[in-house]
UniProtKB/Swiss-Prot annotation:
InterPro entries: Ribosomal_uS14, Ribosomal_uS14_bac/plastid, Ribosomal_uS14_CS, Ribosomal_uS14_sf. This is Small ribosomal subunit protein uS14A. It comes from Listeria monocytogenes serovar 1/2a (strain ATCC BAA-679 / EGD-e). It comes from the Bacteria. One of its GO terms (molecular function) is structural constituent of ribosome. The keyword Ribonucleoprotein applies. GO terms for cellular component: cytoplasm; small ribosomal subunit. Binds 16S rRNA, required for the assembly of 30S particles and may also be responsible for determining the conformation of the 16S rRNA at the A site. Pfam families: Ribosomal_S14.
Length: 89
């Protein structure tokens, strides 16, 4: 489990990215880079790092499922992920 402060920070960053997304898009399209530079740093989507939705773990993130490899494995073994089964060849 990730620290609660890190998970909270990630949620704040996501909210900022969503809040400034439209403004950022228009400023980029119009080439107004001075105004773009004055926006908060955390409003840039490239500063976001993917985190597991269940545990907040930042490493081993599986984009297709939105969770870390560890939680994915646990849930797959329990049969709680529809359409996922253990490979056999």
């Amino acid at each position: 489990m990730a620290k609660k402060s890190k998970v909270a920070k990630h949620e704040r960053q996501q909210a900022l990215v969503e809040q400034y997304a439209e403004l950022r898009r228009t400023l980029k399209a119009e080439g107004r880079y001075d105004e773009l530079r004055k926006l908060p740093r955390d409003s840039s989507p490239s500063r976001l790092h993917n985190r597991c939705e269940l545990t907040g773990r930042p490493h081993g993130y599986m984009r297709k499922f939105g969770m870390s490899r560890i939680r994915f494995r646990e849930l797959a073994h329990q049969g709680q992920l529809p359409g996922v089964k253990k490979a056999s060849w």
